[in-house]
Amino acid sequence: MAQEYTVEQLNHGRKVYDFMRWDYWAFGISGLLLIAAIVIMGVRGFNWGLDFTGGTVIEITLEKPAEIDVMRDALQKAGFEEPMLQNFGSSHDIMVRMPPAEGETGGQVLGSQVLKVINESTNQNAAVKRIEFVGPSVGADLAQTGAMALMAALLSILVYVGFRFEWRLAAGVVIALAHDVIITLGILSLFHIEIDLTIVASLMSVIGYSLNDSIVVSDRIRENFRKIRRGTPYEIFNVSLTQTLHRTLITSGTTLMVILMLYLFGGPVLEGFSLTMLIGVSIGTASSIYVASALALKLGMKREHMLQQKVEKEGADQPSILP
């Protein structure tokens, strides 16, 4: 008669959380969120920023540093819609981005009007350094390039994880990453948050962060499949997730605190980036457990899939952790 064991014995006597017990609930919630995100994106679309729609960029040199918020408020009160201001180079140089102006003459007129408002609001004699018009065609190219970059990243991850681990884990990881990006985009669309190049950068960062979480869990699953001889795949997945839970919570918690500080104190320039990261990291932390891992288990992940493809003598591999 085979010796009975408890799942805690597989984890050296420590408590094991039954994560996989809630896999169908997790799949259901994730599925509803994905459908909702896709519908929202289809109905509301995106609030594309000047990086994608085109616009006028005006570089202005100030006599002395001035508050960005003061100049932005003055421009809005003067009737300019959605002006984007940021320092570049030094505290005396600012860049103003405005919606498209018709032709070169329109850009020059717009530059003069913006300069007048800034001079009046700061009580100084600033000068226009450069005026540049970015056409909609350039913005469309940027949008296409950004989408291709996201797709290339997901494809590269699929190839790497499939080679490094196993295709079932690779499928779970890539689906989880796509899940994170789609839901994040759905939330951005829902709240009509402006999509610019910093948002694309934050989405790439979310993919990288979520991938790191999933790789850590996948590596522990592979290690435990080789070390733990008596556990079922269900038990080994739960043991692996329990063992990496502390690391996941600490890493995600500290990361979210830093991003929250960026959101609260980073100003309008970093607001979209930090908000996207807050949403994506939160979703990615959950998906690394309840999408990537649970999906790999549902795809039939077994011990033999993780072991080296060679004939080994019984007991020649790492010894069981059970007596």
Swiss-Prot record:
The keyword Phosphoprotein does not apply. The keyword Kinase does not apply. Its main location: membrane. Residues 44-142, 192-196, 271-280 are periplasmic. GO terms for biological process: intracellular protein transmembrane transport; protein insertion into membrane from inner side; protein targeting; protein transport; protein transport by the Sec complex. The chain crosses the membrane at residues 23-43, 143-163, 171-191, 197-217, 248-270, 281-301. Gene3D superfamilies: Multidrug efflux transporter AcrB transmembrane domain. Disruption phenotype: Disruption of both secD and SecF confers cold-sensitive growth (strain secD1(Cs)). It is a multi-pass membrane protein. Part of the Sec protein translocase complex. Interacts with the SecYEG preprotein conducting channel. SecDF uses the proton motive force (PMF) to complete protein translocation after the ATP-dependent function of SecA. The large periplasmic domain is thought to have a base and head domain joined by a hinge; movement of the hinge may be coupled to both proton transport and protein export, with the head domain capturing substrate, and a conformational change preventing backward movement and driving forward movement. Belongs to the SecD/SecF family. SecF subfamily. HAMAP family: SecF_B (MF_01464_B). Part of the prokaryotic protein translocation apparatus which is comprised of SecA, SecB, SecD, SecE, SecF, SecG and SecY. The SecDF-YidC-YajC translocase forms a supercomplex with SecYEG, called the holo-translocon (HTL). The stoichiometry of the super complex may be SecYEG:YidC:SecDF 4:3:1, YajC is in the reconstituted complex (with SecDF) but as no antibody is available it could not be quantified. This is Protein translocase subunit SecF. The gene is secF.
